[in-house]
Amino acid sequence: MKKIVSLSTLLVCCLCLAACNTSKSKKEAASETTTFQETTTAQETTTVAESTIEDTQVIGSDDYGYVKVPKSWIHFAEVEGGDDIQYCDGTDVNIVTLNTFKPEHLGVSESEYAALDAVQVSTSVYQTKQQSKDFSKVWGSKSKIGGYDAYVVNCIAKNGKYLVIWIFKSDDGKFRYVSLEGTPEVLKNMLPLIEQSWTNKKA
């Protein structure tokens, strides 16, 4: 099964960004933040309604966090490997992915990791998607997931598939990665389910 985005690809790009950002001045860092914020306010934002999905299951781990997905969705692993937690509806179209950016992924020390903020990581992901030939449109927005403020990278693939990536820092200091990809019809119900159900501990 093949999904649009590979977290390993994003991590390589974030590694370069993190290594660069740790040596930047505060002025340069502020400039990057402003750039992403201007992008988010200038672009459209998806309006999320209440999810109508009632029959759900909790997926995830203590390392990656937990979300609810439809009970009929199944776990799968990429043929090329990777450490994502992924569930799909039985097709290669509608997919939820969970992961966490760790210091070793970003190529930084624990102290450098603690000094990073979500906008730095999200800006790198945003730029990677913008430069990809797979997408016809990429824009940024802000939202809340599990009560946390998140930077959201929204993409429309050339085949019409949508990709939504939430990047945020949870209260345990970890940078979280959650993505949802699929058709507009599926995203309509899945978006609020993901945003309302994410938690870093299983209830």
Predicted segments with their positions:
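Short, hydrophobic/aromatic-rich segments at coil-to-beta transitions
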Residues: T52-V58, G81-D84, K144-N154
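Secretory pathway targeting signatures of secreted, lumenal, and periplasmic proteins
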Residues: D62, Y66-A115
